[in-house]
Amino acid sequence: MVSETVEANGPLYPDYLPFYDPLEKVEMVGPFEHDDPGHRADPSFPNLLEKATNVLELSPHCGTELQGVQISELSTQGLDELALMVAERGCLVFRDQDFTNLGFEKQKEIASHFGPLHKHGWMPHPKNGPEEFVIVYDSKDDLRIRKSWARKSPIQFHVDQSPESQPPGATFFCMLESPPGAGGDTVISNMARAFDRLSPSFRKRLEGLKAVHTTANPIMREIRDNGPDSVLRRPITRTIHPVVVVHPVTKRKALFVNSSYTQSIVGWDEEESDYMLKFLFDHINRGHDFCCRVRYEPGTVVIWDQRVTQHSQTLDYSAGSRRHAFRLTPLANVPIPSLIEEDDGECAKDEGRMLLNLC
């Protein structure tokens, strides 16, 4: 909640300031049965849309802003419908939310409707708050995030913690304070659309492949950047997932490789694997026509489904400007592999591909 004793020019939410403890350890969430709430949802979204004053599509293939809806007021049925809509649209944006002021336990309760909450291996949580919270804090007195992106560009599309055996599903990102003016947006990309944009024969080549996902590189960066102050709550995680997955509710196929965590394709030589992954990463990075860009203001809550999207921060605001947010990351199902199918005739319906003799 907003502190009643905010220092001049200090953070509005001091209870959500980041806490770094190099000695802290956390337990990983064990295997669990995931009952996706989207399965229970009414596809006409009566409970979710009941109070919506406006529904704005951010782009044709990704992102919807629901104006006038308070997440905190949604019934169980409304949260189920939220799960279905975010699976279909990739991400949902809610403005002017009282969610920011509900307190740790109520925030956890709402997010836990979508699955057990992940505990991060190196990013901070609040000092006196639950370990499930991930604090994103960039300001003149804490440049740790900015230092970790000391490259030409911070743009890096990824799935949060894809090396988990059951990676995240619907994920909550809540903006407490945003840079003045503009900047610090999140770009979200639809991986189902990214897969659809590939040629039919190439899609079939990807189906059935598996890839290694690991936290090794991010953990090595944490050690490089922060030395003895590094936070290493969990050992390196390594998991094998399908390259193409199927969403359990919508049944849409989506690419499931990302440049932060995907290391190699199983069974391929290093050169072959690197070549293929570079193509897929480039395809994702260049796919501006299946992305949306979310601009923040205090009280904005964005929910995206990480089984069908990837996202990237932008670091285009001035160093020293405060950007303060938290993330709650419900885990979901074991990734479902896509099965190779016979020609479904979809290519023949694409006039552009037919004209180029690509079918």
Curated annotation (Swiss-Prot):
Residues that hold 2-oxoglutarate according to the record: 186, 323, 327
Pfam families in alphabetical order: TauD (PF02668)
Cofactor(s) needed by this chain: Fe(2+)
GO cellular component, one term: cytoplasm
Sequence positions that bind Fe cation: 158, 160, 311
Listed pathway(s): Alkaloid biosynthesis
InterPro entries tied to this protein: AtsK-like (IPR051323), TauD-like_sf (IPR042098), TauD/TfdA-like (IPR003819)
PANTHER family listed in its UniProt record: ALPHA-KETOGLUTARATE-DEPENDENT SULFONATE DIOXYGENASE
Protein name: Alpha-ketoglutarate-dependent dioxygenase cnsM
Species of origin: Penicillium expansum (Blue mold rot fungus)
